[in-house]
Amino acid sequence: MSTLVKQSLKELACLEDLQNAIGRYAHQMGYSAQVIQTGFRMMFSHWNDAEFHGFIQNEIPELDARYFESFFDIGLSFEKRRSILPCACSERIFLVSASTVPSAAFQDVLLTLLLPVHLIHRPSHSQSGFFQSVHTWLSLKAPRLAERWELIEPTYEDLYLSKIISSCDALNISASQKTIEHFRTLRDGLPIEKRPKKWIEHGHKVSAIILFKDDFDALTDADFDAIAWDASIWDQTGCLSPKSIYMECSQQEAEQFAHQLIAAFDRVAEQLPEIMPDTASLAKRNSALIMAEIEGCRMMHANRNHDCIIIHPEGGFPILLPRILNLFPVRDATHELVTRTAHGQALGTKKLLSESEKNLFSQAGYHVFCGLGQMQNPPLTWFHDNIGTLRPYLMCNA
């Protein structure tokens, strides 16, 4: 591709421009500034020509290659955007962002604005101030994008939300199942002709790591650091963060593994410090750990952050809370992973999986397969939840 892309969307991949907003709102978003900066830096590393090209081929394969450069031009007019699109798309989109991983919401906003749409964005309470600051910044950097991005207050006021839902022809929500169900109720309370034609949901998913016997026996210090990194980015929140490790080993070997991993967590903590969890979160965490101990789990705690490793006995269930990594020493990791996971997302491995193995794990929902240390670093070409980022709004096959 030509250098036009580098002068357009990639021009916004500037962490320095976001430093003020990150520093001011990091604590409100629930992360340390170092964690947020690292997450954005990893995301921006994928804003390059090759991945832009792959992104368009995945999301809008019908787009004429002659228009690839124009598509990423942040100064392109609304009318021109509409003229180069190969088919119709939603015109008013209501985007409801999750309360975790602000870089993901940031990227969703900017990529969606590359379509000829008006975007109504409801960030979470914790990220509202940050995105207000980002909107001000974008108004200076890319006014033609910012003028089509409308931020609203993160309210749960039903009448207000119903009015917005009825005014849009697409709604995209990333949230807990409870919040998703609330928005469904609001939609179902509207006359059929007032309901959005496109309804996209991204509910909670669970990611994991699998270590086969040969992989377990060949682990290096670099592998332990990579696992700790995967579980520390974004404080182990977000759908790509590993919550459990299924590994083919004995309980005794699992304890030795945990000792080595705790040391890795302490090393990674220098780069990815956490902020002190609030009182309610600590109380919930402590209650869960007490119950796990009663159920026969072994635990090890890091010295720096609140990282905790839990070694489960046979038949145990993972604790899905931040900074808790569940270990399951088993005989057949494949069987345990497939039978115990309902909503898988990313699967980290030491070795590359075969296509037949990927097909098997996809039965449990896993569709992101990557090496250790790369779980929270998806390429721009990742087809989010097997749904996509722009594809759901298009009517090319309608």
Model-derived segments and their meaning:
Residues 61-62, 66-68, 73-75, 177-180, ...:
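Short acidic, S/G/P-rich loop/turn micro-motifs used as interaction or catalytic elements
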Residues 225, 233-398:
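NAD(P)-dependent aldehyde/semialdehyde dehydrogenase
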Residues 63-141:
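Conserved small-residue-rich beta-alpha loop and adjacent elements
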Residues 120-122, 170-173, 347-348:
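Short catalytic-loop micro-motif centered on adjacent basic/acidic residues
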Residues 105, 161, 179-181, 354-357:
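Short, well-ordered alpha-helical microsegments
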Residues 142-251, 376, 382-398:
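Conserved NAD(P)+-binding/catalytic subdomain of aldehyde/semialdehyde dehydrogenases
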Residues 1-90, 346, 351-354, 370, ...:
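N-terminal Rossmann-like NAD(P)+-binding subdomain of aldehyde/semialdehyde dehydrogenases
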